[in-house]
């Protein structure tokens, strides 16, 4: 498994875009390519869509609970468990290459519990 962290513009810290990172890393014998941390599902979606369209590797998607906001010098994540679960529900339905999904910064057990409900409901459907 290889993960990269992208900003809201789909770029890594030194400016590499997701397309270049994926093209390089996917040829190194990895089984799964992933995006984690740094952004929420909304900002991550264009990169997830592009990766899904490649249909070459299974995907790991682990966004934050939205973009962090600075409040008194502290990073605060305001995406509710329900809103995040709804966004990830759409990801699971639309992007079939996703094999691993979860939450990173700003998530808590309630975020994961709501995501679990979404996954369980999709299994029933």
Model segments located where?
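Domain-level signal for soluble alpha/beta catalytic cores
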Residues: 1-125
